[in-house]
Amino acid sequence: MRVIDSHTAGEPTRLVVEGGPDLGPGSLIEKAACLEAEHMDFCASVVLEPRGHDAIIGALLLPPSQPDCAAAVIYFNNLQNLGMCGHATIGLAVTLAHMGRIDPGRHKFETPVGIVEVDLQDANTVSVVNVESYRLHKDVTVEVPGHGKVTGDVAWGGNWFFLVKESPFDLTLENVPALTAYTKTIRQALENAGVTGTDCAWIDHIELFGPPKDPFAQSRNFVLCPGGAYDRSPCGTGCSAKLACLAEDGVLAPGEDWIQESVIGSTYRISYQPGTTKGVIPTITGQAFVTSDAHLIFNPADPYRFGIRPQNWTTSWITRTLSVEHG
């Protein structure tokens, strides 16, 4: 299995170029559903230890079904598919350029939540025009054990977010353990209170905000991802959800830039245009760098060839693959 690794503003992406599972015919949405239902063993093996770690986002490269798209992609982490991933889309564009598949300029990628446009400005700099993003609920308050009442907004930026304007902890790397524990408690409180996205969707990302360290930035954030890792980047889909809230609150005008800083100090330049229905069309600009080009090896004698994970996870895809390849 060939993979190419990159990082975008510090957050890693692993693009599976060759050797992924057969997802059968159908739309990209159907293929994403097949990946999550039948091949999470593949996903875990790609992103988890000993080959990876829980902060890696996987991206399965597929042929596009639309003639005007350069590629199709399904994003995943160690638990599930992701409808969209901003940092990984930036990494995808830079990686495809590294492979010689695209040149600088505008391109379209198919994702399970819609077509995403990118502008490859140079070998490392990419602007992503994300799917339409919107705020579902403003000022939702939940009781968080040990912290009292916490208020935030529920918004969609390609994934579901609960955005909290304040944090009891300074948003620094030293406080990552405390920030992680706090945001996990918030996420559980939302679940206990029955707070969801549209169609009862799980709110799997929690985003905290605070004052920036960078004098050119307007805000600093900490983002808890679904698998329990924190986002090293400012989080593209989280920035999209943030833009939807800023727009609706009248804080940021269309086309006006906002510099969003991450917990590690990396930044995205973000802006929006009004959406066609109820939200905004975000543009996220950041940089990615290719870090490795490798082949993953699945040795039948390796007890951790499926990744280090709970014992009740299935191993159907790799088991079938190994039985074919090794008899």
Swiss-Prot record:
InterPro entries for the chain: Pro_racemase_fam
Reactions catalysed, as given in the entry: trans-4-hydroxy-L-proline = cis-4-hydroxy-D-proline
Keyword annotations from UniProtKB, A to Z: Isomerase
Residue runs in coiled coils: none
Alphabetical list of Pfam families matching this protein: Pro_racemase
One function term, GO molecular function aspect: 4-hydroxyproline epimerase activity
Domain of life, per lineage: Bacteria
Keyword Isomerase: yes
Segments traversing the membrane: none
Record Gene3D superfamilies: Diaminopimelate Epimerase, Chain A, domain 1 (3.10.310.10)
Active site: C85, C235
Keyword field contains Isomerase: yes
Record EC number: 5.1.1.8
Record's function text: Catalyzes the epimerization of trans-4-hydroxy-L-proline (t4LHyp) to cis-4-hydroxy-D-proline (c4DHyp). Displays no proline racemase activity.
Family from the record: Belongs to the proline racemase family.
Protein name (record): 4-hydroxyproline 2-epimerase
Organism name: Roseibium alexandrii (strain DSM 17067 / NCIMB 14079 / DFL-11) (Labrenzia alexandrii)
